[in-house]
Amino acid sequence: MHSLTRIKVLQRRCTVFHSQCESILLRYQDEDRGLQAEEEAILEQIAGLKLLLDTLRAENRQLSREEIYTLLRKQSIVRRQIKDLELQIIQIQEKRSELEKKREEFQKKSKYWLRKEGNYQRWIIRQKRFYIQREIQQEEAESEEII
């Protein structure tokens, strides 16, 4: 039974490692949801700024030089804000890509530990069957000696 005890220890260790990987995967999933929500919020901001930019056009109006400069300045500010938000989206997408790579890595580790745990479980079952068969054979041998 000594080897059976060792196998059970190894199986428990695999279970712990597997559950750690699963908790990390859940944390990554939550982080990805947060980044996705942030990206969607920024996209909404960009859409709003583009609408604002459309309203800042000098369509068939007589404008003084100051009004033209003011309008151009406002358009420039809005365009700059749009570019900044687009840059933030790129950064978020890069973070999500890195997160996806980490998630895939931990998924592989999780599957590895789950597979090892299953192997140890099957080994435990085989060992128990072996011990039971050996006990039955010993009992049969003892009963034959008695007869």
Swiss-Prot record:
Source taxon at top rank: Bacteria
Transmembrane helix among keywords: no
InterPro entries assigned to the protein according to its UniProt record, in alphabetical order: Salm_SPAgM
Keyword terms of this UniProt record: Virulence
The keyword Protein biosynthesis is annotated on this UniProt entry: no
Transmembrane segment boundaries: none
NCBIfam families, A to Z: PRK15335.1 (NF011863)
Similarity annotation: Belongs to the SpaM family.
Function per UniProt: Involved in a secretory pathway responsible for the surface presentation of determinants needed for the entry of Salmonella species into mammalian cells.
Name listed for the protein in its UniProt record: Surface presentation of antigens protein SpaM
Organism: Salmonella typhimurium (strain LT2 / SGSC1412 / ATCC 700720)
Gene that encodes the chain: spaM
